[in-house]
From Swiss-Prot:
Species: Synechococcus sp. (strain CC9605)
Pathway field: Protein modification; protein lipoylation via endogenous pathway; protein N(6)-(lipoyl)lysine from octanoyl-[acyl-carrier-protein]: step 1/2
Protein name: Octanoyltransferase
Enzyme class, spelled out: transferase
Miscellaneous comment: In the reaction, the free carboxyl group of octanoic acid is attached via an amide linkage to the epsilon-amino group of a specific lysine residue of lipoyl domains of lipoate-dependent enzymes.
Predominant location: cytoplasm
Active site annotation, chain numbering: 189 (acyl-thioester intermediate)
Length: 232
């Protein structure tokens, strides 16, 4: 049975806010371009621990990604001839599908400024999604032993991260008003028998444009961020 979790008072201490640059591209972004941007910022933070952090909130052009140790058995197509670009990347987790209508958040944060613990960080990313859902009047669910968020046993948010010397990259993907057809090409997150959903299934007419400010606010609150600049 799913465990329903409400809001938790575990946000970063707002008395010590962290400067962060916010990037919100207006058009869907190629995955490799967003990945390169994260890597550059991660390198910057590794070289200068006092540098500001960064967050990307965007939508991707249609693609599939495989985590570090992900199995190709969860692909329902020939990886040599994918229906959309396929990337093997340096995050945890199995296969994920990205496409327009899905909001993706990529925080490049220094966990040593908070809690240097990846399990803590994954739970905080889940809490970001729970906070967004609560603002929409929806009660999200965590499932024991699994990472991500569900509504009525349908997964609406996938989470997978990478980390180098406690500097994070990658993050979360929240299905808002995306097409569901591409998910049939894979076993999302390698979870056989688990359905995938989108927020518009519960709130017809909801758009990514309406949810994006809520996601921005939830990330700032959860990690104690003060936006240094916005690039849209």
């Amino acid at each position: 049975m799913p465990v329903v979790i409400g809001k938790l008072d575990t946000a970063h201490d707002s008395a010590h806010p962290q400067r962060a640059f916010l990037f919100e591209p207006g058009d869907p972004v190629r995955f490799d371009a967003a990945w390169s941007a994260q890597q550059r910022w991660q390198t910057r933070l590794l070289a200068d621990p006092s540098a500001p952090e960064a967050v990307w909130i965007l939508q991707h052009q249609t693609c599939y990604t495989l985590g570090r140790g992900a199995s190709e058995k969860h692909l329902h197509f020939d990886p040599a001839e994918p229906p959309a670009p396929l990337y093997r990347i340096d995050r945890g987790g199995e296969v994920t599908h990205h496409l327009p209508g899905q909001l993706v958040a990529y925080p490049v944060l220094d966990l040593q400024r908070r809690t240097p613990d990846l399990h803590w960080y994954l739970r905080q990313l889940e809490q970001v999604v729970l906070d967004v859902l609560a603002e929409l009047g929806l009660e999200g669910q965590r499932l024991p032993g699994l990472t991500g968020l569900w509504l009525d046993n349908r997964k609406v948010a996938a989470i997978g991260v990478g980390c180098r010397r406690w500097i994070t990259q990658h993050g979360l993907a929240l299905n808002v008003d995306c097409s569901m057809q591409g998910f049939e090409q894979v076993t999302p997150c390698g979870l056989t028998g688990r359905e995938v959903g989108r927020l518009a299934d519960w709130l017809p007419g909801l758009t990514s444009a309406e949810v994006q400010p809520l996601l921005r606010q939830a990330l700032a609150h959860r990690f104690g961020l003060v936006w240094e600049e916005e690039a849209r």
